[in-house]
Amino acid sequence: MKDIAALQRDYARLLIREGLNIQKGQRLVINCPVDCAPFARLCADEAYAVGCREVIMKWRDDYLARIKYLYAEDSVFDEVNQWEVLLADTVSEEGAAWLAIHADDPENLKGVDPDRIRRSQIVSGKALEKFRQREMRDEFPWCVASIPTEAWAKAVFPELDADAAMERLWVEILKACRVDGGDAVANWRTHSDELQKHVKMLNDYNFKSLHYTNSIGTDLTVELPEGHFWAGGSETSAAGIEFSANIPTEEIFTLPKRDGVNGTIVASKPLCHNGNIIDGFRFTLKDGKITEVHAKQGEDILRDACTVDEGASFFGEVALVPYDSPISNSGILFYNTLFDENASCHFAFGEAYPCITGSESMSEEELKARGVNFSMTHVDFMVGTADLSIVGITHDGKEIPVFVNGSFAF
């Protein structure tokens, strides 16, 4: 068995070669916490090894983010740094790859004025709209991944000391990403091929709608837009580069019709959003719009999150993940959406991935007419349970079991 350092290099190689599939002469931006600098350097090494033209580092720091929200002048939260906009727009226009390493303290912004967070999110969302649209349309290769930080590891394993918690979280992350000492890239390709089998079956059924029910109170009907398709595993950029946007991933996803979601959906796991924990929550929707929001913890944060703009009150993603999946079977609550969403079926409120055939040649107005939701935000939340039932309704009215007892029926 390889030691942890060798496995970390295998993981970096996986992200560069399979997550982003870096091409010779292509630039790479790594958006990364300063605490993760050693791993970012491994990723840079691997990128240059396959012919990357230049690696650009975009650092961030939990501590500095927190004290900015606490002590900066109030007007700062209605402004955005133009250099950030210029960087995002420039590299996305040229088709550079973008690696985002998410490893934040789940409660870093606990106690921060939520109005400052909301205003900052709004101004940033508007300024980075062009970049976000390019990302959602897969106009450039992008990948989201995570590695442990001490604050995050202690949140996941509070019973362990810091070193033991870090070691345990590394083990679980590598396991979820199928980095096991063998050929990590080959392992990932095999997994991606398995996801594609379910993608094909769902696309062949071409359901008109899905009906969700379970014992914790979910009773939701989700209409799917005409011409929708399911995706999962790998994606293809505008330049024809195949990449994996999330590592790990267990999901198969599409978009709901913007005005076609009705009923009640109950979250099955806490949500970590903007450095705050939201727990025990549910939504009621009518004609696609969230009309009621309830949460046992963080209700004000959740209300702000789903009202940052008009589109935030509508769903933009429906994703299927078997309850019997490796991350779910670990029994670990990661307080990190990248991992927790891959332990559970989930939805997202806000921006939709335009999973509509021919979407690349459609205008925003044409996409809206087809039922695609637009927003400056996209927030995943988990709804899967061991008894979740999902029934697909075909265009001729037939009911086909999609999920039985939390996992695929086919």
Task: Map each language-model feature to its residues.
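A structural signal for short secondary-structure junctions
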Residues: 258-259, 274-277, 284-285, 309-313, ...
